[in-house]
């Protein structure tokens, strides 16, 4: 009986020590040195500001577009060349979202979207369930003017604990994010930007 009460008491104490809170997604994240949400926001934000203000895209041929002369973009990938498992799709999604909101760009669907589009067109044309005058067909998609793609790299350095450092370990990570915008017709690089981050973590003899 006493043992059961002790277990219940311990469970109550442990439960009281845990909590879940909502927080500001834009708050600076400093829990670990690993790539995190703040890094994603900073890198994407810097690229978007640079691309929107670029003068190199003003000379693109806009013939055949009708009244809407905005640049049509295909969002390529960001290659992860770091040692970390980083979902770079989150970076490209963030960039595409902010560029769309700027009102200066149009985007065509990437491969994942093309699969869904193809499936829907085949359904409309072959199922017999869709009105003929509303059926969509292949061959009417917009052609992208440019493609955006890039790479994320990192350089990591570690210094182990020592008597001189008081048992403190130090880790330094440098991130380099490059992105370029290429004219699909000519393969000319119209814009290129680089964003950098450096993070340092010091860990005491008893860990984080």
Locate the predicted segments by residue.
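Sec-dependent bacterial lipoprotein signal peptides
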Residues: 1-17
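C-terminal/domain-edge helix-coil "capping" segments
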Residues: 17-68, 138-145, 152-161, 166-208
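N-terminal segment of the mature soluble domain
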Residues: 50-54, 58-59, 68-129, 140-142, ...
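Short, well-ordered beta-to-alpha junction loops that form the rim of enzyme active sites
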Residues: 78, 151-152
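Short beta-strand segments at enzyme active-site cores
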Residues: 108, 148-149
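Structural motif corresponding to alpha-helix initiation and N-cap regions
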Residues: 132-133
């Amino acid at each position: 009986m006493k043992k059961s009460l002790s277990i219940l008491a311990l469970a109550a104490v442990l439960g009281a020590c845990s909590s879940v809170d909502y927080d500001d997604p834009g708050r600076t994240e400093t829990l670990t040195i690993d790539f995190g949400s703040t890094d994603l926001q900073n890198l994407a934000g810097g690229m978007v500001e640079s691309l929107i203000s670029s003068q190199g895209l003003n000379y693109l041929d806009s013939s055949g577009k009708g009244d809407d002369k905005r640049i049509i973009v295909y969002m390529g990938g960001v290659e992860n060349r770091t040692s970390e498992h980083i979902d770079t799709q989150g970076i490209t999604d963030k960039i595409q979202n902010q560029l769309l909101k700027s009102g200066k760009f149009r985007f065509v669907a990437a491969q994942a979207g093309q699969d869904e589009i193809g499936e829907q067109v085949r359904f409309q044309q072959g199922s017999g369930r869709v009105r003929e005058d509303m059926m969509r067909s292949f061959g009417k998609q917009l052609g992208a003017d440019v493609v955006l793609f890039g790479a994320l790299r990192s350089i990591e350095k570690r210094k182990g604990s020592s008597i001189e450092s008081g048992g403190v370990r130090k880790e330094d990570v440098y991130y380099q994010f490059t992105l370029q915008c290429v004219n699909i017709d000519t393969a000319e690089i119209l814009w290129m930007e680089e964003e950098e981050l450096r993070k340092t973590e010091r860990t005491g003899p008893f860990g984080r």
